């Protein structure tokens, strides 16, 4: 079983080293590159203000987040959901930095960079020089964006799961892996018995008729020098 976890965060800003915090985290389980329906989602009280420019991106204000769990309250569940899976994110370095900062505040181990799969890097390799934001990729792959009014970690995970499948080979990739299993009936065809091949040879009359037809041909190609 190939298990990956695709995840996304929303934050109060762009730099955890300047005190920006995670306000939302969502994760979605993939097995053989297809969603299983299992997911993790939490809104988080950042224990600080939410700048207006950040609110314009994700729609959350400090009032929305007051009383929500603190990151310390959800960290254990998130780590358990991640387990030892490969971790997929769009512009993954950004999300890794923020989670590492949150884990570091709690004295927890940071994420192993070797587990990172960055869909932005995959997209840039496949579509060099083209826009490769999540919105741009959804439009390129004809993925419905009608519900994406603001950035929302859980919805973005669901959209990114569809984008990821397209980036690694399209909807059929993983489908075969998911549908063929131990219970799938397999038909095996074997040859039954032996078969004698009949060789048909022309009779004297048929040979004579064929020769007569050849003599009526004008300038046959095989007679040319």
Predicted stretch roles:
Residues 1-114, 124-128, 136-151, 224:
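Conserved non-catalytic scaffold segment of RNase H-like nuclease domains
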Residues 102-105, 163-170:
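Active-site catalytic microenvironments for nucleophilic, acid-base chemistry
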Residues 118-124, 183-187:
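Short, flexible loop segments at boundaries between secondary-structure elements
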Residues 121-124, 139, 162-165:
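Generic alpha-helical structural context detector
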Residues 152-167:
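Acidic, divalent-metal-coordinating active-site segment for phosphoryl/phosphodiester hydrolysis
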Residues 166-225:
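Acidic two-metal-ion nuclease catalytic site recognized across multiple nuclease folds
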